[in-house]
Amino acid sequence: MVDIATQLAAVDRGIQTMDVDGVPSYVQTLTQTYPSPIDEVWEALTSAGRIERWFLPISGDLKLGGHYQFVGNAGGEVLACTPPTGGQASFRLSWAMDPTAPTYVTVRLTGDGDHTRLVLEHVAGVEMLPPGMWEQFGPSGTGIGWDSGLLGLALHLTAPDERPDDPAAWTMTDEGKAFMRGSADAWAAAQVADGTDAAVAKTGADRTYGMYIGEVDGPWSE
């Protein structure tokens, strides 16, 4: 059994609507501290053999300037990469379902002995998202996916035997649905903190949850 309540509570979520390099953007952040040293977390995040054990199979050249592709998901380029030194590490990627509309992901690690703080920042230019996506789904449209990734990483690092054998099938169990519902609600709260009306945020969270359980078409549906 996955302790979904503990995992949901372990993540701090933020959303800001702001200009990034002069481009109107949505900036999502997720922060979690793992009970693992920075070298171990870095290896789990940057080794193809490790990544597929907690996220998705990946192909490509995982080094600065290299290109990568997750099976059935996003791909992009490694734009910056600083391995652990002095208790700090980071990397930056372009991240896109559609190569003509890239978004950007930065991951920063801060080590403190046997613990590591991870901050994931996802920057999406307003014009890079499918038309109407943000208005319909809000930050949970991508946020549930990021929450699922951090859950996978947490289980990989701390309780690998508890990771579902088939994560995709797990999302359709009562436990998996409860996790996605909790994630959607948490992102709605973060959106309200950014100034969005609570009713609008809740509607987006409800629609996103419906998308993830197959009751609502997603933004990339034909």
Task: Give the residues covered by each predicted segment.
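Terminal "cap-and-tail" regions of soluble proteins that handle hydrophobic small molecules
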Residues: 1-22, 123-222
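A contiguous binding-surface segment within folded domains or other stable secondary-structure elements
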Residues: 73-151
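Short beta-edge strand/loop motif at the mouth of beta-sheet-based domains
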Residues: 22-23, 29-30, 36, 48-86
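N-terminal pre-domain segments used for targeting or regulation
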Residues: 17-22, 48, 56, 105-107, ...
